[in-house]
Amino acid sequence: MTERPDKDLAFMLQYENIAWYEDGAVRILDRRCYPHTVSFVTCTHYSEVAQAITDMVTQSAGPYPAAAMGMALAAYECREKPEAEQRAFLREAADRISRARPTTARRMARVCETMLEAAESAWNAGEPVDRAIKARAIEANNSRYRKIATIATHLVERFPKDGTILTQCFAETIVGMMLKEARAKGKALRIFCPETRPYFQGARLTATVCCEMGFDVTVITDNMPAFVMQREHVDVFYRQQFLNLFNRSV
């Protein structure tokens, strides 16, 4: 059996601990209170998945697997209906879920469209639609994690052996894969995490992932990055879609 790419990542970056469909329900890690409390929001209707996304139960890249698993749940909900009604139900679910959060609407619409394609394949093959959508969701996770792992491999090669990193917000899988690769290469990174108000993603999520994966991490306030960059010889600054490598000799 092929090793899953989330192996050896921190707890909250493993598939089942982001959003997971099973037995007619979707379970989503509640990042609003993590890591102080490890609790999950359980959804038994696709509209509850959409509401959880709206309510910031999950954020960063979390809404995308949540949307995919929500589509699997929608397929389960309408499984006894005639095929034409199932199609209409899933289309309605895709519309509702994709609009759950305006800032992620375009990408979530693409996710939902991919799950509708999986549903069509399942109908044509006479297979359970919810299982087919869940399988497609896991494939999407695998593909994204492997791409990020490849990027992390090339990125970490450029890190100093004892480098200092400044983060911003919570870069989800990027930070996990980067640290996994750094650990494999024996690089003892020192990490500074701004708190990231108002949800404190840096203090709660990034710092927790770094600590759990065995790295020296310090949480700083949001007005401290310039001071830290001046005093601590920062080699790398990154956030979700941006990275800068600094030359320490300059």
Short names for language-model regions:
Residues 147, 181-193, 200-204:
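Active-site histidine-anchored catalytic micro-motif
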Residues 174-182, 248-250:
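Short Gly/Thr/Asp-enriched flexible loops that form oxyanion-binding sites at enzyme active sites
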Residues 196-250:
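Conserved phosphate- and dinucleotide-binding cores of soluble alpha/beta proteins
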Residues 133-170, 174:
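Active-site pocket-lining segments that scaffold enzyme catalytic pockets across diverse folds
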Residues 62, 171-173, 242-245:
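Short glycine-rich anion-binding loops that position phosphate/pyrophosphate groups of nucleotides
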Residues 99-103, 138-144, 163-165, 193-196, ...:
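Flexible, glycine/proline-enriched loop segments at strand-loop-helix junctions
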Residues 9, 14-126, 130:
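Long amphipathic alpha-helical segments
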Residues 10-12, 18-21, 56, 148, ...:
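Solvent-exposed alpha-helices and their adjacent loops that cap or buttress functional pockets
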